[in-house]
Swiss-Prot record:
Keywords: Glycoprotein, Glycosidase, Hydrolase, Secreted, Signal
pH behavior: Optimum pH is 3.5-4.5.
A Gene Ontology biological process term: carbohydrate catabolic process
Reaction equations catalysed: Hydrolysis of terminal, non-reducing alpha-D-galactose residues in alpha-D-galactosides, including galactose oligosaccharides, galactomannans and galactolipids
Top EC category: hydrolase
Active site: 504, 566
E.C. no: 3.2.1.22
Family: Belongs to the glycosyl hydrolase 27 family.
Pfam families on file: Glyco_hydro_36C, Glyco_hydro_36N, Melibiase
Glycosylation sites: 43, 156, 180, 188, 360, 427, 446, 495, 714
Chain's gene name: agl2
Listed SUPFAM superfamilies: (Trans)glycosidases (SSF51445)
Protein name: Alpha-galactosidase 2
Amino acid sequence: MLGAPSPRRLADVLAVTAGLVASVRAASPISVSGKSFALNGDNVSYRFHVDDDSKDLIGDHFGGPATEDGVFPPIIGPIQGWVDLIGRQRREFPDLGRGDFRTPAVHIRQAAGYTVSDFQYKSHRVVEGKPALRGLPSTFGDAGDVSTLVVHMYDNYSSVAADLTYSIFPKYDAIVRSVNITNMGKGNITIEKLASLSVDLPYEDFDMLELKGDWAREGKRLRRKVDYGSQGFGSTTGYSSHLHNPFFSLITPTTTESQGEAWGFSLVYTGSFSVEVEKGSQGLTRAAIGVNPYQLSWPLGPGETFSSPEAVAVFSTTGVGGMSRKFHNLYRKHLIKSKFATQMHPVLLNSWEGLGFDYNDTTILHLAQESADLGIKLFVLDDGWFGVKHPRVSDNAGLGDWEANPKRFPQGLPDFISDVTKLKVANSSDHLQFGLWFEPEMVNPNSTLYMEHPDWAIHAGSYPRTLTRNQLVLNVALPEVQDFIIESLSNILSNASISYVKWDNNRGIHEAPYPGLDYAYMLGLYRVFDTLSSKFPNVRWEGCASGGGRFDPGVLQYFPHIWTSDDTDAVERIAIQFGTSLVYPPSAMGAHVSAVPNGQTQRTTSIAFRAHVAMMGGSFGFELTPAEMPEDDKAQIPGIIALAEKVNPIVVKGDMWRLSLPEESNWPAALFISQDGSQAVLFYFQIRANINNAWPVLRLQGLDASAKYKIDGNQTFSGATLMNIGLQYQFNGDYDSKVVFLEKQT
């Protein structure tokens, strides 16, 4: 029975909590006292307890450290009149059908058709470190990095078990949660909904910050008031999507980039997802994130277990920027498995925007030679290199036939790649590296693969198979499709000197044959990602989905870089990259200099401006044909490369401070500070010319107030001066930019 706590139980809880709070500073990351639990980070506390009567898990606190020696306020205040008390409770795992009419975290359909659940606490265990999720991407860490609490719950009426796993990364004020559901009964059940994380916050005045967009305009910030009732967003596309990102933040109305409280939530998943925020009638706000229930309905037989993806929640008292830096550092160090996560990225040139499908071995080798002569270190051959019977000379044929086109590469792809990697990079002892584009999850009907295996394409019975970009999606939920992809790419990567792979995905899933296909597809895709990235650890993997359609933590587990957007216009990219950095580290962002007028916006900006914007991404490069560039621009490329190589280590490993936002200012700016604080680089932009007005003063952040900093090797100022008084620069005309280096003096 759920209801108000008895006076005896409330007194017991308060007494236990008082003792728990008094020892916070000396406590381990996870403290357990009786049936009260506390996860303690450097600047966060997450607390809940077991209700004595209902055996439900009741939330006590998620926010700053609770260091008061007294007691917590009552969980439920005095009640007057006839009220449904469950609507006032802060529940950790809200179920369905027993009087809590708010958004549930779990919805299970039993064999008899019942959808009521009654999960009660049974036991718990604490482990050092963090177990990996089976078949799903997940954060990782050793015993000194992370601790884990597993709470075992059970529904005695349906014989269904739920294990709630909480992990705490104290250094990053990050709580990670996932749920396992196990059918312990004799009949089948169906999981209709399972949120990875659901939390009730005892405040009702929030703004919600999220990332919205579409193709070529991903990652745009949206801040809106959390109003009464339910609101949310998600994806039903079969991938995380351009339209929304599996991330949101709840912030107070007064929270800014650098001040105020921010709760951030991020789902480690690549498929369709759902975010739900509900402002209730009793002063609570419920927030939940997980797999989209419209694409779940997962059958679970006796003895079977379903695992949710994990969700990451961080808390910051230093504004939205503080929240972002916690995500950045956690994901760089405890999510991305690749050794390239924090390594300097070689400057690359991608063939796509320069040549498209129109090339042969001679033109490609010439472009590679031009690249090497300019000092570029990695040449990437994009779409169009494959297909024997159905050559990929346009987007209507060849996908799925991963063999080199013999007409384009008569000596064979391995020998051609060997010719490319023999090229000497100018002003360097290096030879040119080679990268290759794939779209392994797709198939053209005009291909040998489709003609041999039409059943491998996702389809729903006799319904027409909808084409997008002249292609269909392979059913990666099938083990034979997974094996085909692994074998096809392994054959190519094992027989040629390929150091980089761009993995593309250019459409969503249509005509799914059953609701749970999306989740099954993701399990198969993660198996493919894990197998290939483990088998070829010396390959740099970069994800892409028509740009940033799959920029999510699930992909980042295996691929250290993701192409941020197909929009390479520098002005648009400032907003896209600033927005994406709300949760994702700039080290993961692919950002390139393309030709002008820009292919997406037709805007013309200087090559310096384009390059400075792109340098804010960890994977910096070019998408153009050097031979078609103006000579003045071409002459600047060696200097741009030298600057990019100087900037890149700070961007890849450092902390980002967004000083001025593109949606709020004509002068957006970001400061990157190295982890040891010894160096910093400032990116400062003017969008439109400033007429008859004073130049803005930019105050820096994140510096050591007592230290001295040399600015571009010239003047020296204290950190206090730079943060409290600031810098002032003169800009010239539209689309001007500055890159400024700061060096801490010892």
